Swiss-Prot record:
Residues 74-80 are annotated as: Complementarity-determining-2. V region of the variable domain of immunoglobulin light chains that participates in the antigen recognition. Immunoglobulins, also known as antibodies, are membrane-bound or secreted glycoproteins produced by B lymphocytes. In the recognition phase of humoral immunity, the membrane-bound immunoglobulins serve as receptors which, upon binding of a specific antigen, trigger the clonal expansion and differentiation of B lymphocytes into immunoglobulins-secreting plasma cells. Immunoglobulins are composed of two identical heavy chains and two identical light chains; disulfide-linked. Disulfide bonds join 46-112. Residues 113-119 are annotated as: Complementarity-determining-3. SUPFAM superfamilies: Immunoglobulin. This is Immunoglobulin kappa variable 3D-7. Residues 81-112 are annotated as: Framework-3. It comes from Homo sapiens. One of its GO terms (biological process) is immune response.
Amino acid sequence: MEPWKPQHSFFFLLLLWLPDTTGEIVMTQSPATLSLSPGERATLSCRASQSVSSSYLSWYQQKPGQAPRLLIYGASTRATGIPARFSGSGSGTDFTLTISSLQPEDFAVYYCQQDYNLP
């Protein structure tokens, strides 16, 4: 077996570093699932791998067989026709979507999206 050499370690670290040079922003949502009942409060979190301007952060709702529906844009502004129970907040890397009192029609999949830096 070839003896360990320092340049091997450097090469490994370089490979780990390269993905960050693309400037790609990764959005991570949590929790993956929520088990709640009508009337309860839902809090969904979205974390960016680097700072995102609030102006470019949106939340979408999607139901089976339907296109995504814009809920929130600019991190906190409700889209037209979206009920007041939906609210968005946050800045920098941490954003939150809150549904103050869940209604039966709110049970769906929710996504956050940033348009600040697209791949």
